[in-house]
């Protein structure tokens, strides 16, 4: 590892910064290093919050780092915040990297503020789920870049996305680091170019921080595996073709969203684009490659059937009060988008699992664990959003129908939470390890350009 000294000097964090705290730290940094730091406001969020871009260095190469591409993913905000500090403090590092850095600590401030209820802890599955928010796909900064592919036509980028579009168009970056993270599982990565030497550094970093690799089911069934826990950067076109092959519906009507920064950048440049996913919670089974006694296809199909049943019960409760929810909000849009698109996505996964030869083998313990335990964890997050939406609606219109719906949804949430926790032996990963892993992965990658 080339950057061991930097990683060993990382401080401890016991919480995540709020959007306002990140902004204040940016202003403080600019005041402390006025000759090294330039801060500009390159746009505003939908709610009018300024999006600050930090420029550091005058290198020949250009790197674009942006955090909170999904607002429930704040690990990268600490990475960007700390990287800005060390670039100002370490002239030798900045000169050796020969890169002009453009850093955005939070590209979705509105959505991130809606997650701040869990940023200070306690870091439990329940508190995370009850305070979780993730927008509908077409309102996600990462997936609202323009695209025109077959029947998929999307040209409604968010104001936040337009900030990234302009930076990509103007800078033609050599390196784009979209600072995502997962919720539960292990470390895995998406990369736009096949760099075997970097895979070794990823594994070395995971070993350094005692973090498991995610060796179970891939996040996306169509992801192309380059190495253990490393996948070729997916495109919206890949998602389209997967749906075209596995459903009888128009993929454009199922996706209803745009491209990513990676897809958009291909029109202007060919940057090394990286995502290093890592979780808040983990269980030792996520990287257990020993064989289970369950066929992988059976594990996947059982998971999809459980998802359908949960979806149906939740949709039934929601439909009772849906007509009374009259306000517009990002929570409502997210929940209703899930209800609208989930059946077709489940059908596509079923079709794929039924015919894929990869499903004929015995599932590893990691694959079985993903299907039986990790997937229900993510369903709990949807349940949390439904509860938040119902609370939001009742606050605007305190009618008894909402009381009954909230009681029913709360019962479903509690039962599902109990089942999820009973099936997990989870630990909370120290934030310092997560920051070190993601920061180290990025530094090692850009050094290979």
Question: Each predicted region: which residue ranges?
Answer:
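C-terminal accessory segments enriched in acidic
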Residues: 1-16, 156, 160, 196-449
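Short glycine- and acidic-rich boundary segments immediately preceding or forming the N-terminal edge
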Residues: 1-51
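Short beta-strand-to-loop junctions in surface cap/lid or active-site-entrance loops
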Residues: 52-60
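Active-site/substrate-binding loop(s) of hydrolase catalytic cores
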Residues: 60-62, 75, 88-199, 203, ...
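Short glycine-rich or small-residue beta-strand-to-loop segments that form or flank ligand, phosphate
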Residues: 64-69
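Catalytic metal-binding/acid-base residues of hydrolase active sites
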Residues: 70, 108, 182, 219, ...
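Di-metal (Zn2+ and/or Mg2+/Mn2+) metal-binding site signature of metallo-dependent hydrolases
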Residues: 70-77
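Short, well-ordered amphipathic alpha-helices
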Residues: 80-89
């Amino acid at each position: 590892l080339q950057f061991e000294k930097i990683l060993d000097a990382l401080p401890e964090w016991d919480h995540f910064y709020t959007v306002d705290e990140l902004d204040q730290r940016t202003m403080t940094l600019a005041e402390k290093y006025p000759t090294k730091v330039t801060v500009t406001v390159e746009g505003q969020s939908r709610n009018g919050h300024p999006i600050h871009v930090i420029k550091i260095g005058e290198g020949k190469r250009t790197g674009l780092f942006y955090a909170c591409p999904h607002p429930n993913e704040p690990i990268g905000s600490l990475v960007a915040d700390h990287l800005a500090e060390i670039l100002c403090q370490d002239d030798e590092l900045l000169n050796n990297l020969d890169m002009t850095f453009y850093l955005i600590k939070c590209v979705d401030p509105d959505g991130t503020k809606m997650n701040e209820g869990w940023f200070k802890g306690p870091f439990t599955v329940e508190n995370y789920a009850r305070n979780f928010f993730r927008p509908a796909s077409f309102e996600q900064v990462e997936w609202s870049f323009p695209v025109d592919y077959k029947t998929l036509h999307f040209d409604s980028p968010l104001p936040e996305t337009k900030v990234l579009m302009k930076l990509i168009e103007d800078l033609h970056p050599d390196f784009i680091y979209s600072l995502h993270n997962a919720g539960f599982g292990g470390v895995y990565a998406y990369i736009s170019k096949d760099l075997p030497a970097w895979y070794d550094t990823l594994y070395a970093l995971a070993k350094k921080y005692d973090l498991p690799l995610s060796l179970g089911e891939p996040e996306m069934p169509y992801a192309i595996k380059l190495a253990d826990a490393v996948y070729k950067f997916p495109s919206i076109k890949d998602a389209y073709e997967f749906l075209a092959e596995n459903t009888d519906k128009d993929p454009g009507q199922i996706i209803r969203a745009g491209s990513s920064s990676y897809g958009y950048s291909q029109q202007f440049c060919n940057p090394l684009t990286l995502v290093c996913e890592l979780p808040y919670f983990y269980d030792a089974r996520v990287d257990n490659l020993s064989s289970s006694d369950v066929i992988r296809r059976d594990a996947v199909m059982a998971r999809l059937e459980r998802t359908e049943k949960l979806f149906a019960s939740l949709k039934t409760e929601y439909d009772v009060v849906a007509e009374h929810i009259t306000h517009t909000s990002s929570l409502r849009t997210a929940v209703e988008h899930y209800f609208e698109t989930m059946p077709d996505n489940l059908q596509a996964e079923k079709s794929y699992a039924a015919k894929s030869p990869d499903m004929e083998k015995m599932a590893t313990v990691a694959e079985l664990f993903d299907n039986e335990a990790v997937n229900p964890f993510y369903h709990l997050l949807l349940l949390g959003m439904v509860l938040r939406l119902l609370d939001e609606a009742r606050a605007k219109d305190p009618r008894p129908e909402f009381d009954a719906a909230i009681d029913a949804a709360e019962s479903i949430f509690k039962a599902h939470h109990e089942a999820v926790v009973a099936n997990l032996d989870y630990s909370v990963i120290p934030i310092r390890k997560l920051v070190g892993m993601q920061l180290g992965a990025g530094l090692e990658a850009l050094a290979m350009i």
